[in-house]
């Protein structure tokens, strides 16, 4: 048995007589291992995909309505609408608006759900508990955060979509140049915007 293994190893080493053949051999080994992993975990992959398909989605046709509502009733500086998938931990910026209008330059960025930023993680837990975390925004937590600061945001609030702790399919972040004078009214307007994004028009 040992001699057979040594014989096979000798044949492989004899075959690898150039850097190209070595690279090809390593590549084949990596692909074979990757294929094995996918095959071995196929039930997990299929299960995750099926669960993702069951998740409700934000009402894409009403995103502009929600943003317009927030600019009109809260005098917002920025409005950012994210699609969230808690199963795989993604939070992707779907739409970004400033007072000048929609800004596509930052759309599509995945800032992740939980990160190495403690303040962000605290807010995410609050969102999952159906709270509306608000506070000063002094330093960026992500690439999108740099955009917030560039647009003049110094104070912000977040709300989950829908405003219901049993589901978490999206997030709205709203920012202002200074803290709103009536924060309770502002939070009510965020709840309305979140409800708008939870269902399509009939």
What are the residue ranges of the model-derived segments?
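A short, aliphatic-rich beta-strand micro-motif
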Residues: 154-163
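Juxtadomain coupling helices with adjacent low-complexity linkers
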Residues: 45-51, 60, 64, 170-202
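Intrinsically disordered, low-complexity terminal regulatory regions
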Residues: 2-101, 202
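Short, flexible beta-strand-to-coil junctions
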Residues: 84-86, 162-164, 175-179
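Short, solvent-exposed loop/turn segments that connect beta-strands within catalytic domains
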Residues: 87-92, 102-108, 164-168
